[in-house]
Amino acid sequence: MAEAKYEPRLKKEYVERIRKALQEQFSYANEMMIPKLDKIVINMGVGEATADSKKPTVAAADLAAIAGQKPVITRARNSIAGFKVREQMPIGAKVTLRGARMYEFMDRLVNIALPRVRDFRGLNPKSFDGRGNFAMGIKEHIVFPEINYDKVDQMWGMDIIVCTTATTDDEARALLKEFSFPFRQ
């Protein structure tokens, strides 16, 4: 007997409901024109990396727990004396999620992490880049359930960029609204 292949909840919802809703709303000529999620990039910059070189590895470990995938340590491209940064010095971590991990992360982000953010009033609907990608920032990484609040010695912020195949911001906004992103009114 063949085992049932795992499919993330949001991907199933996209295939069964969201594609049809977007097709009705924008009446695309071709089924391949319907926008979909391409990737999610999570970036965590560590400003204190100049004083302590171990900070980026600690941040990378937290980011790995959040994303479920090993992050890449980002390094400074050039030296900036004012910030005490040297070329090739580790200054942060980033991870690119695609496929099932992307849908799982988005599910946790929308349903668990964003409601736990203090004084959350909704996402800024103007944070689109003009080409269908959405960027947002989170000030504290402890809103994710994978991070144990008691074991955290320092809180870091992170940038989350949701890349879609949509060509306009309106299409991307409609796609993310269907995924129940809580946009500000």
Curated annotation (Swiss-Prot):
One Gene Ontology cellular component annotation held by this UniProt entry: ribonucleoprotein complex
Molecular function in Gene Ontology: rRNA binding; structural constituent of ribosome; tRNA binding
SUPFAM superfamilies: RL5-like
Alphabetized PROSITE patterns for the sequence: RIBOSOMAL_L5 (PS00358)
Origin superkingdom: Bacteria
Keyword line: Ribonucleoprotein, Ribosomal protein, RNA-binding, rRNA-binding, tRNA-binding
Record note on quaternary structure: Part of the 50S ribosomal subunit; part of the 5S rRNA/L5/L18/L25 subcomplex. Contacts the 5S rRNA and the P site tRNA. Forms a bridge to the 30S subunit in the 70S ribosome.
Protein's recorded name: Large ribosomal subunit protein uL5
Lineage: Bacteria, Pseudomonadati, Pseudomonadota, Alphaproteobacteria, Hyphomicrobiales
